Regions:
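Helix-start (N-cap) detector for alpha-helical repeat units in TPR-like alpha-solenoids
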Residues: 39-41, 74-75, 108, 115, ...
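Conserved structural position within tetratricopeptide repeats
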Residues: 61, 65-68, 99-102, 143, ...
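Canonical tetratricopeptide repeat
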Residues: 79, 113, 120, 154-156, ...
Length: 224
């Protein structure tokens, strides 16, 4: 567990180098794309300077202040996402990258940053055995990724579905089987097995009820 957490932290640090310190010009936005008032221009410049210097906390404060005045700035959403990512606040990073992508759906850099953050979060969720939540993140990654990368991610999802189904089989519960089918109706192999299990259980219950009715009926005939 400790080794995994260290690996995750190391993963985040390495990605921060890619996303922040050794960033390509398109990763960190140091100039606004829209026209701003002089006050907002100065505020943007101050926040950008703090981020460039690696002053994460103060940069976050300034960018949030700017965002209150300019909520539709996708550049600032991206910059905040990078800062929260570097600060190990993955949930907030995902939120801001996602909001930025809503404002600029075709912005590849935002997509890439969001995917990286989602990968970190899904890995943490998987380690914590929160498989359903990890699958939600991985499914989102599939939607954001190019076709050539989707198959590998879909295999990850299938592997997690296998883990969930193992737990379902251990439970031997009708409710658990039905819930699995509701969430994963097309899980390769697992969904068909779940349907068959439910069908057999219902059939056995039906036969049991018929036998019970038959046994109740026979004594009444004997009495007559």
């Amino acid at each position: 567990m400790k080794l995994f957490k260290l690996a995750v932290v190391g993963f985040i640090i390495l990605n921060y180098i890619a996303l922040g310190c050794a960033k390509a010009p398109s990763q960190f936005s140091d100039a606004p794309s829209q026209s701003l008032s002089k006050f907002d221009q100065k505020l943007f410049a101050r926040a950008a300077l703090h981020q460039q210097k690696g002053q994460i906390d103060s940069a976050i404060v300034l960018w949030n202040k700017f965002l209150q005045r300019n909520p539709n700035s996708f550049e600032v959403r991206n910059n905040l996402g990078l800062l929260y990512y570097a600060n190990d606040e993955i949930v907030k990073a995902i939120y801001h990258f996602g909001q930025g992508l809503k404002l600029r759906p075709r912005e590849d850099q935002l997509k890439m940053n969001l995917v990286r953050a989602l990968k970190v979060q899904s890995a943490i969720l998987e380690e914590n055995r929160e498989y359903d939540e990890a699958i939600v993140d991985l499914s989102r990654i599939v939607q954001l990724s190019p076709a050539k990368e989707q198959e590998a991610i879909e295999r990850q999802i299938e592997a997690l579905e296998d883990q969930i189904f193992k737990q379902v089989k251990k439970s031997d519960s009708m409710g658990e089987y039905q819930e699995f089918l509701k969430k994963y109706p097309r899980s390769p192999g697992n969904s068909d097995e779940a349907r068959l299990w439910i069908e057999n259980k219902l059939q056995a219950k039906k036969m049991g009820n018929q036998e019970l009715l038959s046994s109740d009926f026979q004594p009444s005939l004997a009495t007559e």
